[in-house]
Amino acid sequence: MDLQLLMKYNVPVPRYTSYPTVPFWHDSTDLNWWQQSFRQQFEQSNQRDGISLYLHLPFCESLCTYCGCNKKITTFHGVETIYLEAIIREWNIYRALMETKPVIREIHLGGGTPTFFSPQNLALLLEAIFET
C-alpha cells in the first residue's frame, strides 16, 4: 500500500448523522417556512414513492466495540415506555402537518439495538405509526 495515500486519508472525519449536515444549521429558521417546506417535501415523496422513516432506538444492554452510534447502555428496561411515548408524540406532531395519509414504504429501526425493546412495545410503536 502506498504510505502517502494511507497518510492522506488516515484522518478523522465527521460522521454523516443528519440532513442537512450541521454546518448548514442556523438559528434563523422560520417556523412557517419550515412547516411549508416539510409539507411540500412530504407530498412530493408521498405521491411518488411513499416515505421512509428512521426511528432511533438508542438503547443497548452492552456496548459493541465497533459501535459509533448515539446510544445509551443500560439494562433497565423501564426506559422503553417513556422513550416510545416520546417518539409517538413527535410522530403526531409531524402527522399533524401531513395533509394526506402517509404511504410508509419502509421503516428503519436503529441507533442501539432495536431488540432491546420488548415485542409488545415495538408493536405499540408500529401500531401508532400505521394507525394514522
Regions found by a protein language model. Name each.
Residues 87-97:
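A short, N-terminal amphipathic alpha-helix
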